[in-house]
Amino acid sequence: MGSVKSAGLSLLLLSFILYVVDSYPSMDLSNMGCEECTLRKNSVFSRDRPVYQCMGCCFSRAYPTPLKAMKTMTIPKNITSEATCCVAKHSYETEVAGIKVRNHTDCHCSTCYFHKI
């Protein structure tokens, strides 16, 4: 009788573990908190008419600088980084409360022109 209880308890525990594992989200958590590069309504400038701007994340990575490349640098840096930014493919200029802003119409990941310091 004791072995039946033990087997039943083991089966119950295994079922619970499988339930927990199955309910765990199976998604890429590397970019958690940063959505894909898309058009979003800018709440600051969207007073009398909607103004859309590109927001979101794209590709970025950092890796050790190859020795051959470090020898060519005027100021050697141990880490090299690459990145693409969420930028507007198409946009047009509009005026909101006397301020000229760009209303984006399409976004994509491309070369970063402006970097945050």
UniProtKB/Swiss-Prot annotation:
Belongs to the glycoprotein hormones subunit alpha family. GO terms for biological process: G protein-coupled receptor signaling pathway; positive regulation of steroid biosynthetic process; regulation of signaling receptor activity; thyroid hormone generation. Glycans are attached at residues 78, 103. Disulfide bonds join 34-57, 37-86, 54-107, 58-109, 85-112. Keywords: Disulfide bond, Glycoprotein, Hormone, Secreted, Signal. This is Glycoprotein hormones alpha chain. Shared alpha chain of heterodimeric glycoprotein hormones. These hormones bind specific receptors on target cells that in turn activate downstream signaling pathways. Involved in gametogenesis and steroidogenesis. It is found in: Secreted. GO terms for molecular function: follicle-stimulating hormone activity. SUPFAM superfamilies: Cystine-knot cytokines. GO terms for cellular component: extracellular space; follicle-stimulating hormone complex. Heterodimer. Glycoprotein hormones are heterodimers composed of a common alpha chain described here and a unique beta chain which confers their biological specificity to the different hormones. Residues 1-23 form the signal peptide. It comes from the Eukaryota. The keyword Secreted applies.
